[in-house]
């Protein structure tokens, strides 16, 4: 506006001037002109400030409208909208008038001014025009900003309109869905609609302008009440009640009404909004699947269903595969072709050669002749080059006979000492076996499976296998526990021809993702390394499950350094006509190991260990074996205090730490290792010179494996064993190992063993040598299930739990234990020798006793209580009947009744009166008789921990001292479902005593101990046998 008014004043002034006016102006005119210019500029600045302020206010109002539109009342929204429309109209009118004025003041008007102005005026006007141009530029920028603001406002209004349309469309769809889903509730809804209808009378908003209300109808619908939603909010409780009735209705009704009720609850049970008491307005509801409400019965049903599904899934893992329904593709096992050089050998030459190779013995028909070099076993050139590269010059004794036997397709049992090359003996035939078959396709499992008992052995076999697999293009995966399963699953899904595994984790892999990770349909070659320990450690069920899922015509190979006779029968179950190859006798220590056994006291062990370390540690690495994890950690601390850097290895360490410890020990980073028997197998360490058995091994096989860690691959090694006098029972196995390996037995060790045998013979005990672990895993049979059910029943009874489906649980715990005892009571009259245990009277007391006796006889005579009057009443009645007389009513004196009561009380108190002892003593050489009470309590059917509780030596001794009764354990344990043969009895406790009270006290104490153990089983019950450690 400033620019247009200024031009207008200039044009009117030019019209009023005379054409003959002089070119010069007076000073007053100039001053007035400058003042007008200053005032116009100040007015322009004020106008610009006002525009900027108004623009900021408009923007801030728009932001506030976006945030607070739903929270403000409708009246303020309408008034604000009216003010907004009026301001827009004013801005549009201003912009239109400004455009007309700017077009009327064109640049051509400046040329129509009089040409008789002075040059000074032209200069002044030139300066003013430059300022005016600058102002014009500013005004144009302001107009652009205004246009941009109007565009943004229009765009915002358009977006709001579209959003409202979407909301209305969504509301309509939700309304239709809700109406479709409440068909079954229509009758109840109609009844409640007649009682109470929704009305908008309590809406206190008055419409000021009906025309504006119609224009703003779209905005008002966003805030208006949805009658259906409001009604559903009010009948919320009725829907819940109907839902509860439908759930309780039964299976048939549940199937019909279940989906409908679920959908209604989805609409209703949303997050509860705070509803004003005066204004019951609808709330925008969204589907919230997580907010669905369930009754307690529905939740219980879901839990039961989930538990049943989980148990069914677990049972499915135990189901064997029906191989008759699977069509396996054929494969070839026999690849061995005997070279002419071996074919020419006679049987005598073969026997001589086997004798030279450390006395190879072979059992089984059709075993091929042993080879003498690698080229004779029929392997490829790639494998020969790998053998040469890694330093395998010629076959070891076990390899000379095992490789051709396996190449011929026969099952094998290989027995050889540690460090003899058993791994290569089954790897080379395996590579030939795999290369003969077609390559794996997507989704197929391995061709060869190697199972080991320990993770360390699995890693070592994998490392050995990868030396050859890379050149052959085969993939090897090591599957073992203690590490993340996701990486191993990823490797198996990519495919692998060879899997080296521990049995437990392999079963997890076969069951993962419903068997989609891997399978055993392509497996034709199975290896069990350290097979005896795998069965001893309780892996038998897992191994058998894996083997049973492999095709029956597979080739199975077993290798171990020890193979007890008890394992052979078990091994032959999964082998078909096996060949047994044994090298160097059964379980012997390598001749390269120098063995020393030291009989020493416990306190001197550590000092002797320090002496050995000072002598041998500079020459190589050292392993110290202990029996328990806590002993390993304790010895580690002692060695660290003695400035010996060392590490500890046992089963309680994480798998990652175990791997790093073994790598550091193999690399020579740490040369001293304290370990339990977990490192006794499969640990091949170069430059290992000394093995110290700090804790004496408890059986022969463990000693052989510990000593076998040193003296490998032809190197010299030393093995020292500490044994104390308390460990004399282990001396027999140590002596056996020394004798079989050709080592002299120390005299002090022989003396310790002979003293132990003499002591056992004196105690009447039979000496049995330990044959290794006898652990076993789950059998998953009916016997275990019956035992578990029986234990659960006892636990319920111990806790007083009652189940409507279990009648036995309601029986009292004492009655339950009493019934399981199946007790048998006996009372025997025992004749004792005449010698009395009462000491003979002294000379001083003899006269007093004689006087007392005479007085007693005189009193009996006076009261007519002689011997003849004390005849038994039944005897008198019998005599009367025999004589033909009549039986009179017996007369019992008060003294007789008193004596009978006194005898009962004395029997309960285990008290013998002095008068009776005197009478018995006075009878002299006559023999006396007494009663012995016996009771038998059968404990065979109680849980194992309860039997242990009452049959331990300490418990029996404590009960005997408390009750003064003798308790012995008799019979044999029979598992549930197995009945004893004729002449045998189930295990029971025999309680014996001279009086009945002692027997009752002993029985009550035994019952108390069993009851406490049954109650404790409620929280600590485990189906496995308890060991030293618990899994927390």
Curated annotation (Swiss-Prot):
The modification N6-acetyllysine is found at residues 263, 776, 904. Residues 201-211 have a biased composition (Acidic residues). Residues 26-49, 112-200 have a biased composition (Basic and acidic residues). The keyword Zinc does not apply. Disulfide bonds: none annotated. Residues 1-227 are annotated as: Disordered. It comes from the Eukaryota. GO terms for molecular function: ATP binding; ATP hydrolysis activity; RNA binding; RNA helicase activity. Pfam families: DEAD (PF00270), Helicase_C (PF00271), KH_12 (PF23469). Keywords: Acetylation, ATP-binding, Coiled coil, Helicase, Hydrolase, Isopeptide bond, Lipoprotein, mRNA processing, mRNA splicing, Myristate, Nucleotide-binding, Nucleus, Phosphoprotein, RNA-binding, Spliceosome, Ubl conjugation. Residues 403-581 form the Helicase ATP-binding domain. Residues 1-24, 50-73, 81-103 have a biased composition (Basic residues). A lipid is attached at residue 2 (N-myristoyl glycine). PROSITE patterns: DEAD_ATP_HELICASE, HELICASE_ATP_BIND_1, HELICASE_CTER, Q_MOTIF. It catalyses: ATP + H2O = ADP + phosphate + H(+). The modification Phosphotyrosine is found at residue 294. Belongs to the DEAD box helicase family. DDX46/PRP5 subfamily. Component of the 17S U2 SnRNP complex, a ribonucleoprotein complex that contains small nuclear RNA (snRNA) U2 and a number of specific proteins. Within the 17S U2 SnRNP complex, DDX46 is part of the SF3B subcomplex, which is required for 'A' complex assembly formed by the stable binding of U2 snRNP to the branchpoint sequence in pre-mRNA. Recruited to the 17S U2 SnRNP complex following release of DDX42; DDX42 and DDX46 bind the SF3B subcomplex in a competitive manner. This is Probable ATP-dependent RNA helicase DDX46. It comes from Mus musculus (Mouse).
